[in-house]
Amino acid sequence: MVRVPFVTAVTTVFSYGVIFGFGHLRDWFRALLRSLFSGHSPAAAGTNLKGYAPICGGQEDFYYRRFVRRVQDCFWRPIASKPDAWFDVVERYSNDSNKTLHRTTKTSRCLNLGSYNYLGFAAADEYCTPRVIESLKKYSASTCSVRVDGGNTKLHVELEELVARFVGKPAAILFGMGYVTNSAIIPALIGKGGLIISDSLNHNSIVNGARGSGASVQVFQHNNPAHLEEVLREQIAGGQPRTHRRWKKIIVIVEGIYSMEGELCKLPEIVAVCKKYKAYTYLDEAHSIGAVGKTGRGVCELLGVDPADVDIMMGTFTKSFGSCGGYIAASKEIIDHLKHICPAHIYATSMSPPAVQQVISAIEVILGEDGSDRGAKKLAQIRENSNFFRSELEKMGFEVLGDNDSPVMPIMLYNPAKMPAFSRECLRQKVAIVTVSFPATPLLLARARICISASHSREDLIKGLEVISKVGDLVGIKYLPVEHEKTTSAEKLKKIQ
């Protein structure tokens, strides 16, 4: 759990107070002036029609207008190349204080420290790309149908079998979008009379899926098996609300690597608790499958957990495999159940065949079935790159969240003003960084999120470290003690090189 330094917390709250206070004051004056000069209240926000209820309004609209709009040049940045280790970022400008952003014809070649391209498959690949092109010629870009009708190609069946074999489960089912895999599957697995116990920092797709299920939802402290056991015991003893009947079923939902924390799930302990209380385990491996483990099989392999002890395994193809979509792997009984009742499978167009072929080819490379050892080298490279980059950031005095072997490493910024300053200055120095703040994180815990790739060379990483160190000094985000050495940071990095 992040402990915000007292002075940092005070200055951060003060900064938000200034933003919100002056924002409300400006809105009040705007409404007053409009009322005085027009003689009536302004038209509903989001429409030009008087008398209509506002489509856009409330605190969300206020937060966007008074905070997000000021820094929106740090988000939605268009790129003009593949998201490899380096990519082209389109330059933009604004003449109205970021209300509108205009693209230029210029691009900046930047080091990519933001994409989920963990194994480097997002770039052209000697094995994957020719097969993807061939599948495009044979099957076209879309099936134009759902799986139960005309959208079930040979490739879809092959990938389901391959995924099941890769993760160590009897069967699997595919979905066209990773977010939907969680938000649509959870309501298909559990409903009224059931209990979902969710980690407090689970992804929004899990949160929305749990809310939409109709089941009761309880939250346990992040990555805390002891508190999970307390919640389980309390809920089992109390039963369903009002009736106190036994729960129809209990599902505990956790992530393999938490995308905003970079932390590995304490899976062995959580599985032990679930087995003790006869609760199902649902594991979201969106950021861990393909990225960790000796052969890329995720946190189960990394932490020594038998996949048979995890009831439902979810993952996406958007990170390690350079494609799109997601999957659920479980027993054949569960997968058959989902194929017959899950709306996202029955009514949604199936995955694009070239996207399916990309995943098939990527997994074959990881498994060495392409006849080379490139997959093993990629897995060793991302592990080495991740641990090197994390270690150097910590030595520089940055507060870095997460665990070793995780390719996700958040750098704490805290103050809302430091977020755009850090992002803009890094981009100016040709390093593309993702910055995140409320509502994706708690209000006081704004951060930059680094994602490392196997395609990064040591020179790339050193370039990124040099820029991040300089900008960190400029913005003032080195909250921890720096290693005391006589050499400068630049000299130290040259020695490493």
Swiss-Prot record:
<dbReference type="GO" id="GO:0017059">
    <property type="term" value="C:serine palmitoyltransferase complex"/>
</dbReference>
<comment type="function">
    <text>Serine palmitoyltransferase (SPT). The heterodimer formed with LCB1 constitutes the catalytic core.</text>
</comment>
<keyword id="KW-0256">Endoplasmic reticulum</keyword>
<keyword id="KW-0012">Acyltransferase</keyword>
<keyword id="KW-0808">Transferase</keyword>
<dbReference type="GO" id="GO:0046513">
    <property type="term" value="P:ceramide biosynthetic process"/>
</dbReference>
<comment type="subunit">
    <text>Heterodimer with LCB1. Component of the serine palmitoyltransferase (SPT) complex, composed of LCB1 and LCB2.</text>
</comment>
<dbReference type="InterPro" id="IPR015424">
    <property type="entry name" value="PyrdxlP-dep_Trfase"/>
</dbReference>
<keyword id="KW-0746">Sphingolipid metabolism</keyword>
<comment type="similarity">
    <text>Belongs to the class-II pyridoxal-phosphate-dependent aminotransferase family.</text>
</comment>
<keyword id="KW-1133">Transmembrane helix</keyword>
<dbReference type="GO" id="GO:0030170">
    <property type="term" value="F:pyridoxal phosphate binding"/>
</dbReference>
<keyword id="KW-0443">Lipid metabolism</keyword>
<comment type="pathway">
    <text>Lipid metabolism; sphingolipid metabolism.</text>
</comment>
<dbReference type="GO" id="GO:0046512">
    <property type="term" value="P:sphingosine biosynthetic process"/>
</dbReference>
<keyword id="KW-0472">Membrane</keyword>
<dbReference type="GO" id="GO:0005789">
    <property type="term" value="C:endoplasmic reticulum membrane"/>
</dbReference>
<dbReference type="InterPro" id="IPR001917">
    <property type="entry name" value="Aminotrans_II_pyridoxalP_BS"/>
</dbReference>
<feature type="transmembrane region" description="Helical">
    <location>
        <begin position="4"/>
        <end position="24"/>
    </location>
</feature>
<protein>
    <recommendedName>
        <fullName>Long chain base biosynthesis protein 2c</fullName>
        <ecNumber>2.3.1.50</ecNumber>
    </recommendedName>
</protein>
<dbReference type="InterPro" id="IPR015422">
    <property type="entry name" value="PyrdxlP-dep_Trfase_small"/>
</dbReference>
<dbReference type="InterPro" id="IPR004839">
    <property type="entry name" value="Aminotransferase_I/II_large"/>
</dbReference>
<dbReference type="InterPro" id="IPR050087">
    <property type="entry name" value="AON_synthase_class-II"/>
</dbReference>
<keyword id="KW-0812">Transmembrane</keyword>
<dbReference type="GO" id="GO:0004758">
    <property type="term" value="F:serine C-palmitoyltransferase activity"/>
</dbReference>
<dbReference type="InterPro" id="IPR015421">
    <property type="entry name" value="PyrdxlP-dep_Trfase_major"/>
</dbReference>
<feature type="modified residue" description="N6-(pyridoxal phosphate)lysine">
    <location>
        <position position="319"/>
    </location>
</feature>
<dbReference type="Pfam" id="PF00155">
    <property type="entry name" value="Aminotran_1_2"/>
</dbReference>
<keyword id="KW-0663">Pyridoxal phosphate</keyword>
